[in-house]
Amino acid sequence: MTTLTREKIVDGIADPTNEKSIVKPYVLSHGTMECYSLKESRKFYEEFLGLECVRHAKPAMVVRCGLKFHIVAVEVGGAVHPQNVLNHWGLDVGSKEEVDRVHKEAIAHKEKYKIRQVLPVVMQHGVYSFYLEDLDHNWWEIQHYPGFQNEDLFDFGDRFSMDDGAEVGELKELNIKSTA
């Protein structure tokens, strides 16, 4: 997989364009998510999702894949806040066939990894993908995009004015409920 990562991401650096901002960061470094149990979640992250995990603190561990960006998973027990599918983490795979294979594996291993929901595979917003809700009510999108989506999104630039309405009522994802 290292080869595929290096083929897809030839240049992983995006120079900041923040000359006029108050904060002048050099990188978006991390995000956070909650989990019931680090031990149970780590099994899912490593064995199913293929993420690298390091427990760097008693209540937390970091996960990453492919880039030097990480997610901090924090064990909060029963205080977990279930997420909506619009709050999800995306994992890119090498082909549509790989999306289909992983979708079948997700269904086959729902009980083993305590996967709560596996949604159908769809072609949407330019990617072939499906969503799954993990044991901690976090959502993951397994997707294939022919190219590197991050580069294309930013290279294409704004397609709509900030004065255009968001048309929130058309977001069918708002109707997808967590299993909580």
Please place each PLM-identified region on the residue numbering:
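Short glycine-enriched loop/turn motifs at secondary-structure junctions
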Residues: 24-27, 82-86, 124
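Residue-level "edge-of-site" marker
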Residues: 58-59, 119, 150
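N-terminal beta-strand motif that seeds the catalytic metal site of vicinal oxygen chelate
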Residues: 2-39, 89, 148-180
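Conserved short beta-strand elements that form part of the metal-binding/catalytic scaffold
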Residues: 3-17, 52-87, 93, 132, ...
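Amphipathic alpha-helical segments
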Residues: 36-52
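Vicinal oxygen chelate
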Residues: 35-39, 90-139, 147, 167-180
